[in-house]
């Protein structure tokens, strides 16, 4: 079993999705099971420290169906802590990650999870209440010239 005990404390949603996807892909490559912390009961995700917003909990269970995840919740206790510092794909980690390890890092390469596309597509299905709210917003704010702005913080 491998896990990501700190999922949610190392980046916001995009990073969390990459981290989870990488965990699934690495586990699949090595034939391991995997787990993530259960944050289903969390009602807040960030805290302020001075001028900084610190992310504490992952949002995946709140935003996505996570159909493939099942009940794979938990923490890796007393195992290896693997801190990935590099941005590029680490083939050694992908092929030789030790059993009973928790992963920490950004995992900024699709190569970690290109083998798990089917599983991840089942997990990353947006929850109905979010889709409904988005559809209502678009219906209520219909315009001939829609625009989208993405604000990157950090």
Regions found by a protein language model. Name each.
Residues 16-28:
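Histidine-anchored nucleotide/phosphate-binding helix
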Residues 43-154:
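Secretory-pathway luminal glycosyltransferase catalytic domains
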Residues 7, 37-38, 150-151:
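Short His-Asn-centered micro-motif
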Residues 8-18:
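A short, glycine/small-residue-rich beta-strand->loop->alpha-helix junction that serves as a flexible
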Residues 32-43:
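A short beta-strand-loop structural module common to alpha/beta enzyme folds
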Residues 25-34, 69-70:
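Structural alpha-beta junctions
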Residues 1-6:
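Extracellular/lumenal mucin-like low-complexity stalks
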């Amino acid at each position: 079993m491998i896990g990501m005990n700190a999922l949610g404390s190392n980046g916001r949603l995009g990073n969390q999705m990459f981290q989870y996807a990488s965990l699934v892909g690495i586990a699949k490559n090595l034939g391991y099971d995997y787990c993530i912390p259960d944050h289903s009961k969390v009602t807040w995700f960030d805290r302020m420290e001075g001028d900084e917003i610190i992310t504490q909990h992952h949002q995946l269970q709140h935003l996505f169906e996570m159909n493939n995840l099942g009940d794979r919740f938990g923490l890796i206790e007393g195992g290896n802590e693997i801190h990935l510092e590099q941005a590029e794909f680490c083939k050694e980690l992908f092929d030789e990650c030790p059993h009973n390890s928790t992963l920490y890092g950004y995992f900024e390469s699709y190569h970690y999870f290109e083998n798990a596309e089917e599983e991840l597509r089942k997990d990353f299905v947006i929850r109905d209440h979010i889709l409904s709210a988005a559809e209502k917003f678009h219906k209520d704010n219909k315009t001939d010239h829609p625009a989208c702005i993405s604000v990157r913080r950090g």
